């Protein structure tokens, strides 16, 4: 069986298209394989840095774009117009009108496609703007993340510093707590010692009372013995001896009492000092607790930048940057200079505390800013996620566009193959048509057949006619088949034009993408410059922070040196004060020894004077219950031994009590504890009668001060109170000008009722002066 020509043409056309498509795919795969090698893929996958990975991906995409552009240029370089012209020349003139009509339709379709392209460009323009905005935001977020990481590292180091400070303060607090416990134990021991001393004082007071009762009994016995004349001389001698022994015993007891009092006053002063130290320690502990709470609050709150705090540390007082050599202790001979130095150190310490409070305020501001930055960071992270989603969508669209472009390229290749096959088929048909035309001309040139009876000629003519009929059939078949082929060619040409327009649009998009890539490269360069500048600024700030830390350490050292200096100055001042107290104690001891010797001599002379005077004996006859000798004894022990001076006018009589004026106390007998307590007891004697430590109790007042007083008693008291001019010349001034400590014992020394308030005022002024002198 013979296969028709149409089937053969279709089979050959399919074989050619399959071969060409396979060759094209092989070439394309080989070229793409040259572009995407496994080495490049491994390099991209092994890149840990996102920047390098992005750069390598951009290079790969650029290579793909260049490949696509070259292929498009090759497609356009093909002489499609010449092919179309060759087809049009071969086609009959009747088809020209159809082609013109189809050209009009194609122009309309071209306009529609251009409108679609413009619409797509308008749709793509805002997406490109969004991409630029997204890239800017990503750059900002990346910078902020880098800054946040640096701040976090900074704050971690600063938090470690704060933790070390808190540990130091806790250790210091524990040491202070142990010191506080030790001081409390010492205070309790001092209290126990003070109570023991009080009990001993009471016991000695009872012994003194018993001793005074014995003296009274002995005085009564003396009175009984004096009534007998035979034993007077003997008893007088015995009484003198007993009196001297009693006076010595009383002096010893009074000395022990005074030592006990001095010990009590020393204990009281030590207790006061300990109480002050305990109060200072409590205040210091409270300050440390406040500092601990402040440090703990700072440790819990500080999670961000403290640059403001460090800037504030620069403005600290530069006067504190003193070296240790400048802070050495000099000569502390002048106590006022030492006090001024201590006051200046305290002022510096107060200034440091104020600066610390200002820094705490700045830290609170920094915490507020940290919270604000956290909120901004969260907002930026949310925006970043949104932008990343949009980028993924755009990448998906780009991949879909690439796939469409690949499909279009495949279709273009298929159409090219079809065009080539059609060209070959048309060439073959044209050759066969020319052959048939030549045969027809030959047939026409043949002579017409003769109608004869010759069979050979008839057969010849019939064979030629059959051949002519076959040729005419072939021609008709070709004419019937040509319009189908031409219609297919027109459709393929229209499709090619559409594909060309799409390729032009894709080229434009590629140009836009190139421009965007160039802009991205420029932005990357700018970002790199900014990163370099940021790194430089960070390096400078790190150096600045190191300088601030060094200054902070130097300030801490200066504070420690200042505290050490303050302690050394305190120790030096305490040593000076102790030396002065020792010197004053020595002077007081010397004066007390002199006073005791003088009082003993005077007592002996007074005893002799009492025995020789007849006036005393008359007084004993009138009032047997009283005795001038105990009065005199009590007078000597109840007199004030403080350094008071009584001034009188030379013209008036010194024995007149109203003419005596109190002068200020002397500064030569200033002591720390002994004279202070003695002066307080002496001044409070006229107001506190119920005090057990007083020289004379209420029971003794009943003995010495009776309601039945007479003129003789007052005169006798004046006699014993005031000395004669000879005695005044013999005795020293502080004994001559002495006055009784308790005026209730000596009514003759009372002032008038009008002047009683003045006397009390003078006593109060005296108290104030003593307190001012002893710095109470």
UniProtKB/Swiss-Prot annotation:
Keyword Coiled coil in record: yes
Entry annotated with the keyword Coiled coil: yes
Any coiled-coil regions, as ranges: 87-122, 173-227, 265-307, 362-430, 496-595
Keywords: Coiled coil, Meiosis
Domain of life: Eukaryota
GO terms classed as biological process: meiotic cell cycle
Protein name, per record: Meiotic expression up-regulated protein 1/2
Highest classification ranks of the organism: Eukaryota, Fungi, Dikarya, Ascomycota, Taphrinomycotina
């Amino acid at each position: 069986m013979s296969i028709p020509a149409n089937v053969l043409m279709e089979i050959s056309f399919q074989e050619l298209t399959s071969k060409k498509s396979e060759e094209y795919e092989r070439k394309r795969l080989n070229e793409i394989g040259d572009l995407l090698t496994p080495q490049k893929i491994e390099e991209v996958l092994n890149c840990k840095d996102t920047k390098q990975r992005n750069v390598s991906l951009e290079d790969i995409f650029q290579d793909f774009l260049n490949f696509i552009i070259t292929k498009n240029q090759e497609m356009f370089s093909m002489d499609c117009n010449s092919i179309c012209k060759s087809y049009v020349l071969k086609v009959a003139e009747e088809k020209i009108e159809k082609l013109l009509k189809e050209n009009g339709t194609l122009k309309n379709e071209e306009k529609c496609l251009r409108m679609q392209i413009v619409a797509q460009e308008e749709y793509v323009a805002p997406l490109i703007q969004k991409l630029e905005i997204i890239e800017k935001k990503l750059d900002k977020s990346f910078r902020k993340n880098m800054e946040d990481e640096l701040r976090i590292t900074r704050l971690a180091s600063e938090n470690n510093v704060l933790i070390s400070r808190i540990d130091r303060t806790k250790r210091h607090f524990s040491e202070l707590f142990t010191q506080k416990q030790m001081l409390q134990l010492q205070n309790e021991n001092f209290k126990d010692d003070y109570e023991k001393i009080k009990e001993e004082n009471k016991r000695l007071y009872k012994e003194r009372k018993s001793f005074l009762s014995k003296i009274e009994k002995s005085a009564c016995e003396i009175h009984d013995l004096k009534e007998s004349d035979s034993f007077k001389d003997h008893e007088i001698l015995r009484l003198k001896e007993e009196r001297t022994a009693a006076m010595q015993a009383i002096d010893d007891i009074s000395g022990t009492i005074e030592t006990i009092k001095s010990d009590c006053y020393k204990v009281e002063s030590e207790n006061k000092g300990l109480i002050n130290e305990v109060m200072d320690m409590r205040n210091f502990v409270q300050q440390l607790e406040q500092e601990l709470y402040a440090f703990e609050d700072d440790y819990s709150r500080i999670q961000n930048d403290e640059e403001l705090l460090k800037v504030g540390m620069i403005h600290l007082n530069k006067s504190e940057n003193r070296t240790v050599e400048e802070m050495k202790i000099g000569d502390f001979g002048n106590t006022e200079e030492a006090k001024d130095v201590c006051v200046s150190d305290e002022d510096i310490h107060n200034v440091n505390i104020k600066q610390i409070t200002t820094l705490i305020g700045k830290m609170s501001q920094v915490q507020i800013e940290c919270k604000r930055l956290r909120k901004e960071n969260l907002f930026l992270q949310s925006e970043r996620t949104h932008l990343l989603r949009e980028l993924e969508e755009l990448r998906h669209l780009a991949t879909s566009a690439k796939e469409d472009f690949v499909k279009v390229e495949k279709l273009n290749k298929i159409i090219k193959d079809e065009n080539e096959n059609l060209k070959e088929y048309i060439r073959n048909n044209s050759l066969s048509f020319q052959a048939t035309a030549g045969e027809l001309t030959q047939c026409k040139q043949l002579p017409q057949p003769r109608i004869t009876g010759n069979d050979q000629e008839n057969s010849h003519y019939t064979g030629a006619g059959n051949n002519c009929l076959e040729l005419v059939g072939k021609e008709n078949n070709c004419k019937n088949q040509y319009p189908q082929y031409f219609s297919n060619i027109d459709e393929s040409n229209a499709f090619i034009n559409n594909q060309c327009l799409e390729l032009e649009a894709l080229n434009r998009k590629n140009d836009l993408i190139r421009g965007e890539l160039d802009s991205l490269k420029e932005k990357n360069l700018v970002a790199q410059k900014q990163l370099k500048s940021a790194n430089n600024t960070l390096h400078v700030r790190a150096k600045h922070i190191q300088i601030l830390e060094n200054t902070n350490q130097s300030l801490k050292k200066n504070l420690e040196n200042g505290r050490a200096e303050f302690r050394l100055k305190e120790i030096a001042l305490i040593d000076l004060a102790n030396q002065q107290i020792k010197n004053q104690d020595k002077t007081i001891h010397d004066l007390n020894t002199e006073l005791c010797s003088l009082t003993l001599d005077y007592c002996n002379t007074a005893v002799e004077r009492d025995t020789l005077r007849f006036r005393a004996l008359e007084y004993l006859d009138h009032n047997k219950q009283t005795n001038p000798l105990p009065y005199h004894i009590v007078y000597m022990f109840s007199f004030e031994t403080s350094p008071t001076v009584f001034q009188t006018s030379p013209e008036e009589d010194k024995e007149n009590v109203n003419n005596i004026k109190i002068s200020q106390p002397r500064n030569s007998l200033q002591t720390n504890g002994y004279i202070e307590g003695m002066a307080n007891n002496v001044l409070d004697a006229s107001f506190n009668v119920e005090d057990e430590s007083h020289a004379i109790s209420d029971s003794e007042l009943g003995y010495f001060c009776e309601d039945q007083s007479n003129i003789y008693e007052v005169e006798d008291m004046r006699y014993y109170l005031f000395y004669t001019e000879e005695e005044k010349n013999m005795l020293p001034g502080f004994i001559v000008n002495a006055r009784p400590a308790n005026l209730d014992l000596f009514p003759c020394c009372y002032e008038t009722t009008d002047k009683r308030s003045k006397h009390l005022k003078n006593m109060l002024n005296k108290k104030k002066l003593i307190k001012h002198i002893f710095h109470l």
